[in-house]
Amino acid sequence: MMIHIPKVLTPEQVARCRAVMDAAGWVDGRSTAGAQAVHVKKNLQLPDGSAEARELGEMVRAALQRSALFTSAVLPRRILPPMFNRYDAGMTFGSHVDNAIRFVRDSGEPLRTDVSTTLFLSEPDEYEGGELVVEDTYGAHKVKLPAGDAIVYPATSLHHVTPITRGSRVASFFWTQSLIRDAGQRALLFDMDMAIMRLNQDHPGHISAVQLTGVYHNLLRQWAEV
């Protein structure tokens, strides 16, 4: 299940991210790649743990906590500190699957990567190429969103970034360990949550909405890992 999360960051926050990144030093993105991804990854990243990455990462995490849609789609338990990358002309990231386990930067604590997120920080007309392509049983899905918007998708997905042919593309990317390990169960809960919200809008206080909310929370209680 891929979910588009619009307007995670405001235009002012995007501008702040761009200003910080424009003044920052970048390193080879292969420094954080896994054993297979290192052979197909060609991009730049803000140094993990740098002052710039920490400032922008806190901004992103605070914005995510305010996003009801992100919470409903992902049901986050723990979010790995956001990272930031840049693709210039000729850069790309070939097909790969994200590592199942990553480690929190400061504590070294392991985190299971259930959900991947890309938060776009460049406008689509600033670059050509650079689409995120996520593959599932229904085919390949190209994603290129306005600055400040995010896409979330199961971290089990095969995906790649097409080569940049003009301009530069900057983004934040990170992983979340969900309360719900199984992507199918997350999708069912998300669909139910959306249906409950629509029912509440159309028929405020209706007993069916109350009953469905109870079913939602009982399923969450049954499936959640806390």
UniProtKB/Swiss-Prot annotation:
Fe cation binds at H96, D98, H159. Keywords: Dioxygenase, Iron, Metal-binding, Oxidoreductase, Vitamin C. Gene3D superfamilies: q2cbj1_9rhob like domain, Rabenosyn, Rab binding domain. One of its GO terms (molecular function) is L-ascorbic acid binding. Disulfide bonds: none annotated. Its cofactor is Fe(2+); L-ascorbate. GO terms for biological process: DNA damage response; intracellular iron ion homeostasis. It is an enzyme of class 1 (oxidoreductase). Residues 78-178 form the Fe2OG dioxygenase domain. It comes from the Bacteria. Its EC number is 1.14.11.-. 2-oxoglutarate binds at R169. This is PKHD-type hydroxylase AZC_3753.
